[in-house]
Amino acid sequence: KDDKDIFIARKKYTSQEQFKRDSIILWRDEICKKYLFGDPDRQETHLITETEVEQIPVITREVSFHNKFAVEMRGLWRTDNFVMGGPFVSYTLADPSKGMLYYIEGFTFSPGKDQREIIRELETILYTFRISSELTTPVKN
C-alpha cells in the first residue's frame, strides 16, 4: 500500500527572500522537525529535506499557480535516522492581501515502487489549494 501525505503551513509574508530555495528548505525542515515523524515516539525520526544526494538535487522553479507567482520545489525527504525516505513536491505562494505565505506539500513513502504516478496524483490534489482571496462567496437566493 502506498503512503501518500499532504501538509499545509502558513506564516507571515515579509519579503521576496522567502521564495529563495534555501529559505524554503529551512522552513520545510522546521515544520517537519516539529510535526512530522516516522515514529511519533522517537524524535530522531522527524523528516528532513535530503540535500546530500548530488544525483538528485532539490530543484526549485518559478511557476504560475492559479495565475499567481509560486515556487515549485521537488526533491527527496528522509527521516533523520535514515530509516525512511521518498520524493516530495511542494509549492510556496503568497497571499499579499492577507500578508501570509503558504507552503503546501505532497510526499510519499512507497519503497520499491515507481513513484511518478503517486507524485502526479499528489500534484493534482495540491493544485486544488486556494488562498482565501480566490474563494468566492456563494450567491444567496
Model regions: which residues?
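Secretory pathway targeting signatures of secreted, lumenal, and periplasmic proteins
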Residues: 2-43, 47-50
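Short, charged/polar low-complexity linear motifs in solvent-exposed/disordered segments
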Residues: 17, 90, 120-122
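A short, polar/proline- and glycine-enriched secondary-structure boundary/capping micro-motif
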Residues: 17-21, 83-84, 113-118
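Signature of long, low-cysteine stretches enriched in small and polar/charged residues
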Residues: 41-98, 113, 127
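Surface-exposed amphipathic alpha-helical segments
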Residues: 1, 102-141
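Compositionally biased, intrinsically disordered low-complexity regions enriched in proline and serine
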Residues: 14, 36, 89-92, 103
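Secondary-structure transition/turn motif
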Residues: 10-14, 76-78, 107-108
